[in-house]
Amino acid sequence: MLEKGEHIEYPNTPPLHSPPESHTFSSQTDDSYFHKPSSTGLFATLVADTNSSVPSASRSPESIASSQSNDSAAIPSYRRKRRKVRKPEIVKPTLRKRGRKPKNISTLEHDKSKPVISSLIDEDANLSQIKARKSVLESRFSRLEEAFRDFYIKNLEKTEDLIRTDSHFVLNKELLSFRNDYEHRRKHYEKYSQCLNKQLDHFFSYKVTTVHKSYQRFATLLRRHLLDKTAKRYHDLCEKRPYKYITTDLLSPSLTCFASDILQTVPEYTSSQSSPVLLPATPSIVTNKQMMDDLTLCNV
């Protein structure tokens, strides 16, 4: 155990880049073995400089600058002190304030600007100078007018020649685009009209066939109904006559099929003096007049 006031002395470690013969452990303190730690970073404090044994006075400025650059390069970028750059002040645009209208409008009478025509002419100009100025301006305007007229006439003549020879670039381009658009629209409408005509034909043919079938069915049902009504009427009329043994049932649905039987004979009575009764048969084909008569008769 150590007593108070005593401390352990460790041998001084040699520098990292010292020659091998100097690796001797001694308890004596030697300033050449120590390297003053640099405050620039951890790497510079741990790694000894190769030129530590050389005094600073005898070192060249190039070596000092290189060592300082190495020390600064050893510092990581996020630890370096950045120089503060003064930001330029943002110049704000000045707002133009509208001037207040003066309460007294009479103050503006002296600030009125001169009119344009009067500003072009001096106040001290004579009448002859004004007339000369007027003549100069008139001649200039006449020359400008002639130049513009010649320019537009030449352009119009050139344009007319180009149109006449069918070589006007802009008009030909417009005509070509118009023709292409017209042809495209015409083909489109032709296809559309053909498709529409097909749909209409199909629709009308379907409707015609449907109506025709419905009419045929309705006509058949009406004819059968009228025949049944007329047969019933005939039966009611024939019940009042003295006949027997009728072989055909007048109310049967087969009335439309016995058109070959034009007349039906009824057998004689027990009396030999009576004559046979002739009954009209139900027709298989009904005319329009007979149909209307039957409808009126049967109250259908």
Swiss-Prot record:
One Gene Ontology term from the biological process aspect of the record: transcription initiation-coupled chromatin remodeling
GO annotation, cellular component aspect: chromatin; nucleus
**Subcellular location(s) per record:** Nucleus
- Look up the domain of life of the source: Eukaryota
Query: Keywords assigned by UniProt?
Result: Meiosis, Nucleus
Region: Disordered; residue ranges are 1-38, 50-109
Biased composition of type Low complexity is found at 52-69
Question: Which residue windows does the record flag with biased composition (Basic residues)?
Answer: 94-103
Record field: compositional bias (Polar residues): 21-38
The protein's role, per its UniProt record: Has a role in meiosis.
Q: Per its record, how is this protein called by name?
A: Meiotically up-regulated gene 165 protein
Q: Which organism is it from?
A: Schizosaccharomyces pombe (strain 972 / ATCC 24843)
